[in-house]
C-alpha cells in the first residue's frame, strides 16, 4: 500500500472505514440492550399501515427508560469510532479529513434513523447526533497513536 496513489488510497480508506462502521454499529446493539435490560423492539410488519407502525414505535420508545438508550447511543458511536479508526489507519496522509468523512456518513445514517423511527426522545437524538463527529475525531487520534505519521 505504500506505493499506491495517495488519492486512490484515501478513497479506499474511506470505503473501508464506511464498510467497517456498519457491523461495528450493529455489533454492540444487542449485547448492550440485554445488559441494560431494554425490552425487545417490536417486530416490523410490512403489511401494517404507516399510522399503526408509527403508533407502535411511539409506544415502544415511551416504555423505555434513559438507561435503555445507552445501547443504541454507544453502538452508534462505536460505528463512527471504528470507521474513523480504520480510515485513519489506511489513509495516505494521516489527515483528519478522511476519518471525518466516514464519521459524517455514519452521522447521515443517524439523522436518517431519527426520521425513520418516530417517537425517539429528543434528548437522545440530540446527544446521539452531536456525538458522531467528536467520536470520529477520537478514532482518528487513536489511529495516529497506533500508526504515527512518519
Summary of predicted features, one role per range:
Residues 3-150:
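Juxtamembrane/disordered regions of integral membrane proteins
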Amino acid at each position: 500500500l505504500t506505493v499506491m496513489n495517495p488519492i486512490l488510497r484515501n478513497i479506499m480508506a474511506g470505503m473501508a472505514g464506511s464498510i467497517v462502521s456498519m457491523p461495528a454499529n450493529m455489533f454492540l446493539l444487542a449485547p448492550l440492550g440485554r445488559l441494560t435490560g431494554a425490552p425487545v423492539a417490536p417486530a416490523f410488519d410490512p403489511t401494517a399501515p404507516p399510522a399503526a407502525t408509527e403508533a407502535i414505535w411511539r409506544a415502544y420508545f415511551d416504555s423505555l427508560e434513559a438507561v435503555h438508550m445507552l445501547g443504541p447511543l454507544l453502538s452508534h458511536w462505536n460505528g463512527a469510532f471504528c470507521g474513523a479508526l480504520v480510515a485513519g489507519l489506511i489513509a495516505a496522509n494521516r489527515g483528519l479529513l478522511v476519518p471525518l468523512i466516514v464519521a459524517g456518513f455514519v452521522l447521515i445514517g443517524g439523522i436518517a434513523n431519527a426520521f425513520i423511527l418516530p417517537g425517539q426522545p429528543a434528548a437522545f437524538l440530540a446527544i446521539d447526533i452531536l456525538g458522531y463527529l467528536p467520536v470520529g475525531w477520537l478514532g482518528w487520534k487513536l489511529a495516529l497513536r497506533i500508526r504515527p505519521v512518519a
